[in-house]
């Protein structure tokens, strides 16, 4: 179905009668628009009148992490832009669930070392972790990703490679590859003897995460195919006895399609007819280009491990011609990091997934992080204090878009973040500052009535009717506080006044508290308390509370820091804590007065 969409960064242009109005790009474009231009043009050249096909590939070999999400978000954003312009488009996600189980990921609940017995089997033949509701390993990890993609508004057609191979969908392609195995071997041979180019001086050395990612991808050398005494074969059977792929093809007859293989794991051997045998797959460097041709893929990005010289994307660009297809437009995408952690690799457990991120941030923010950076730019997703700064940046952008002051590229990224061609994603009705919500959740410790009271005090002229108005953002901030803030950084309000500290205060310290206490009632709102706590040191120094930094000597900043530290010590027994206006609101006026010695 053709769709039209109106977006702030687009111009609508009426075409001739009976032609739908579609969204047209403005001259100022972002990376998504530029790829969409290229993809539409290429699709019309290759397959005029047919839906544009973009693709992603995900291997459910373990938790599917936030780096893998870039494999999906890059084509999703391009597909969505194509759809906004009124074109039909399919976003395929190939679940590589017929891949071999390579290793047991660490730190996966319900999994122990006994899972190593299944190494070499298809992922769909490996048991799911203990306690899982899913029938096998692949379905267990696929399910979590499907749920996250739904929350992110990603529309796709999923293809199980287990289903494709075991039902014989690719039979003709397999027979064709076997018939042309000499041509495939010759292409692969061009790269087997080449050494990787020396890394440039300014490049960082490959870290363990990158090596792990390469090992878990089609860049691994073993995905080249076997070349034993009987020659090269681009096809690998799974053993009929142990189900593993420790097999070697020992003979093949093109006319009869009789194939004999032996398993080095269990010693089993058999002869089958490949024109009716469905328990095996093409090796990765042949499988991928075969699928490009079979599905007519126009756009599919790949990670740096697939894009290096001699790796699967480069080699596939030559092999795809054997299947009568063309290589897709395929930008390389960079690694995605986590604040405070090394680059991610899904062959390790314990690495944050999209589901983990969506517990602490709204889908709009996560979409924005992927939309605002070109695929070849690396970026980090924050699970530490940095998330508060990211949310501040997002809220500022939101305000600029609303008042028309945002730059066109930023407007485009914002539009892609808040919705798709099908409409806007559900959003928080009253998006209060994330850092404020986090502080309130921290201090109230799950008491929703107390949280509502404090949040209503933020703006007494427009109080919250219920906590639902601040959801789901409030729930995300609460989850971040509860799961990602170390215990020693949590805020615990003092139960009793610090009598010793209060007694030790000099006249200036006592006067600062008096000025604050005298102004509490009249300034009991977020803005009012902000003005008050910054104003007390100004007034003490003989300036107006409204004086700007330019009108003040540098020592006022020092006095403010000392005053803030005093308040933190009296309220929470530490040098620092949540922003003071939020903390004061959270503690409540009566308790603040008691803790400050009134």
Indicate where each model-derived feature is located.
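Basic, alpha-helical terminal appendages of large translation-related enzymes
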Residues: 2-51, 63-64, 90-92, 202-203, ...
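Active-site cores that bind ATP or allylic diphosphates and position pyrophosphate for catalysis
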Residues: 6-10, 154-354
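N-terminal catalytic cores of NTP/NDP-binding nucleotidyl/phosphoryl-transfer enzymes
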Residues: 20-109, 289-308
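The substrate-binding groove and active-site-proximal loops of carbohydrate-active enzymes
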Residues: 62-69, 124-135, 160-162, 166, ...
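A structural motif corresponding to the C-terminal end of an alpha-helix
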Residues: 85-87, 144-157
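Charged, often glycine-rich, active-site loop that binds/positions anionic groups
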Residues: 98-116, 173-174, 342-349
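A glycine-rich helix N-cap at a beta->alpha junction
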Residues: 113-134, 148, 152
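Catalytic adenosine-cofactor/nucleotide-binding cores of aminoacyl-tRNA synthetases and other
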Residues: 308, 313, 323, 334-486, ...
